[in-house]
């Protein structure tokens, strides 16, 4: 499973959504997904591992990475924010196994604050700020809260 992990382009470079090379910050894990029978990619911008499955159409969308990654996965989850797609997957797995596995909204907020304190930047604004792809902490936590309510209806521990 790859979540929001930059994949290489046709030229084997790693580009952020603005076309800037970030190869020096990326391990070449793309090779782990080649020829593997079952794999999952979760992405939002076109440059993430898995989005190579849509490499032919991504260049036609203004807000997506061009050139896109070419690294494919057997399954692809696309969401407005990659984290949200991952949370949806975890909620689905929670339902299947009958156990609540999803992080709480407060724990997620704490984690975001910690990584920002360590120097992480927001993927949309390119600024060291408590946001996730342009969404502030409150806006971002709404997805987890909604998924937690969904799980509440399932009587999961």
Provide a role label for each language-model segment.
Residues 38-42:
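Hydrophobic/aromatic beta-strand patches that form the interior of the parallel beta-sheet core
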Residues 2-31:
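An acidic, phosphate/nucleotide-engaging active-site surface
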Residues 5-7, 43-47:
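Glycine-rich beta-alpha junction loops
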Residues 48-157:
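C-terminal functional extensions of proteins
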Residues 32, 36-37:
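Internal alpha/beta domain cores that form substrate/cofactor-binding pockets in large enzymes
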